[in-house]
A protein has these predicted regions:
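Long, contiguous binding/interaction regions
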Residues: 1-92
């Protein structure tokens, strides 16, 4: 079993920007079973829009079935989240 560190860019709907702090808190308090969120930060994108940068350590190995996909699906399930993009990935 190994661990993977992944940095994500999480986009919200334009009309959900007022919920960005709530989404940051939801991501930060995610269940640690799939992955441990290390950092959550709001960053400017353009024209008053923001995105959330998330760094997480995710368990990887044969005993885990698609852990990255499960983590991403969980983030996408939060209200207002439209897209999640992998920015960086590496093994620990």
């Amino acid at each position: 079993m190994g661990e993977v560190i992944v940095k994500y860019k999480v986009m919200l709907e334009a009309d959900s920007m007022n919920r960005i702090d709530d989404v940051c808190n939801e991501i930060d308090s995610m269940d640690k079973e799939i992955g441990a969120v290390q950092f959550v930060e709001k960053k400017p994108l353009a024209f008053g829009l923001m995105f959330i940068e998330v760094t997480a350590i995710i368990q990887d190995g044969e005993e885990f079935e698609n852990p990255l996909g499960k983590f991403e699906d969980l983030v996408k399930s939060f209200e207002g989240v439209t897209e999640i993009e992998t920015l960086e990935m590496g093994r620990l």
